From Swiss-Prot:
Assembly, per entry: Homododecamer.
Biological process per Gene Ontology, one example term: symbiont genome ejection through host cell envelope, short tail mechanism
Residues annotated as signal peptide: none
Start-end of Basic and acidic residues biased regions: 668-679
Function according to Swiss-Prot or TrEMBL: Forms the portal vertex of the capsid. This portal plays critical roles in head assembly, genome packaging, neck/tail attachment, and genome ejection. The portal protein multimerizes as a single ring-shaped homododecamer arranged around a central channel.
GO CC terms, sorted: virion component
Localization in the cell: Virion
Domain of life: Viruses
Gene that encodes it: 59
Transmembrane segments: none
Bias kind Polar residues: ranges: 680-689
Organism the protein comes from: Enterobacteria phage N4 (Bacteriophage N4)
Region (Disordered): 668-706, 729-763
Protein name per the record: Probable portal protein
Keywords associated with the record: Late protein, Viral capsid assembly, Viral genome ejection through host cell envelope, Viral genome packaging, Viral penetration into host cytoplasm, Viral release from host cell, Viral short tail ejection system, Virion, Virus entry into host cell
Amino acid sequence: MEQNTDSMVPLPDPSQATKLTSWKNELSLQALKADLDAAKPSHTAMMIKVKEWNDLMRIEGKAKPPKVKGRSQVQPKLVRRQAEWRYSALTEPFLGSNKLFKVTPVTWEDVQGARQNELVLNYQFRTKLNRVSFIDNYVRSVVDDGTGIVRVGWNREIRKEKQEVPVFSLFPIQTQEQADALQQALQLRTDNPRGYEENVDEAIKESVRFFDETGQATYAVQTGTTTTEVEVPLANHPTVEMLNPENIIIDPSCQGDINKAMFAIVSFETCKADLLKEKDRYHNLNKIDWQSSAPVNEPDHATTTPQEFQISDPMRKRVVAYEYWGFWDIEGNGVLEPIVATWIGSTLIRLEKNPYPDGKLPFVLIPYMPVKRDMYGEPDAELLGDNQAVLGAVMRGMIDLLGRSANGQRGMPKGMLDALNSRRYREGEDYEYNPTQNPAQMIIEHKFPELPQSALTMATLQNQEAESLTGVKAFAGGVTGESYGDVAAGIRGVLDAASKREMAILRRLAKGMSEIGNKIIAMNAVFLAEHEVVRITNEEFVTIKREDLKGNFDLEVDISTAEVDNQKSQDLGFMLQTIGPNVDQQITLNILAEIADLKRMPKLAHDLRTWQPQPDPVQEQLKQLAVEKAQLENEELRSKIRLNDAQAQKAMAERDNKNLDYLEQESGTKHARDLEKMKAQSQGNQQLEITKALTKPRKEGELPPNLSAAIGYNALTNGEDTGIQSVSERDIAAEANPAYSLGSSQFDPTRDPALNPGIRLGN
């Protein structure tokens, strides 16, 4: 190990460290260490219990039997055996499916965001994190220590490299086509952002960006390229780490709820090279005493590094750093704000606000068996310590009983065989013996003594009690249904009790995973890349936008035990038998897909959900003909309806005509109308005869027709009565009616009594 041999070189002075923040009430290292020193006693008391539990599992320390010469030191690992049975039962529900998290929206506005978060979260646990290793450590830490402590963080590694990017020149839009292209791009970005990013030309994207900034419509033309330095992310994903409970000290005044803790302090090992990678985060590295901060000089830090091993290279030399997460009034306004600080030795190298978006401590505690009003839980070792000690004592007694016996040895009296025959006896040859001493009676064969039945019963009782305490059912006896009777109901009661105990532990583990998922969701919405490509299946990929991950969500962890899955599959199978073949085929396929999911057959489940039956051409043609037949029958029915409507209208019209005819006959209207027709016919005949007389050629010597007499006669027969009987009356009427005035253009000769003597004949 490297030593500081040059005593003339002064150590760095931590008091000369650079101020790290602009806070009004910047914290001092002494204030942070005061919290550490105040919480150490309660933390040490808890770690003593954890060490006792681990000693019981590993048979170390006080749990290891003392050495006694000639006596057995065997100690059965009862606690370890029960834990080994528990590991696989608790890890399989988390690893049995590729889909670990299920995200549901709180409001309808978060539906799309919930689906995106579910895709990203499950994708990260499948590809970015070693899910198998984490779940194994997660379960083993909880089962062994009674409490699992998970630290959630974010890993971002970038590399700067030079790339050629296009250079554009912007010009005012001159044609309608350019304006339409810009308008279509703006509309596509709103309707289909993914299609916009994938299909739109970079020049149009540049025009859109300029339009967003200035509001001016332009079109871009690439004029060349330029080399610029861009950041290429090498890693950008969340991290989850199982912490050693000895290396994290939590506020003991949190009343069993870590969310109420005012601080949590973690010690971890690092080196100068790791700190230099993050120059923007860590400062004052030149003030650190790297030699005195090695793990061997930090007794409160638990490490797996051997004490005799230490790297001499100053850049790789391991040192212990303390990271403080808590809440302080940094502005002096009475408001506690989340902060994080890191120090090595006596030098504060980091002090800033909590960078995580939820503003909480980045730790999740998962108890195995909860203890009232305590944030730490208890493992099975707390229950099995006495049973393991008793079982070990009984087992050592039985082994000592067998080991101290002279098994396989023979004894005989002295003088039974002489020297020659004794040698023959030992070499397996025929020998002679003294006839007074029968070898069958004199030679004694030593064997193992019979084990006392009480010892075997005691060992069996300890195993049964251990399995009853933990609820773990082993192959070799243990928890049985004999106390309930050797019937199916009794056995089912025992299995149900064990499965309920196991499910209760699983729920606590699932709750811890849910809290981890919630913290990662909050980080994804801030730290994730603008676009993230997520693999859904072997052929399907989805691009997730960081903006879509914001919202309020409920997160569930999809877990189930083999017993529960088997029971569900049996229930679904019984449901299929109940509904029979008379239900829609799609419902049957969905139920079969659920059964395939429960049996861990994702490919079969996917095939069942996406299967579409291929139609039979003959059946399809018959269906089409049946549809056409139904359409024709429908048209025929419509035509009959139209015919019935027309006949009904005709009947109504005939009824109206009959009613009208009846009314006209009763009122004399029809008779009067007939008279009018006859009168009009006679007048027409008269006028026809007069016209014929006027147009008929006269023979020589015939007199002309008397038109006045004919007109007068027509007037008499037509019943015309003007009321004017003489010339004097005509002159008086001419003053009011120009039809009686001889000089008027409206003069009517048929009304003049002088021209129509027949007018006077009527009276």
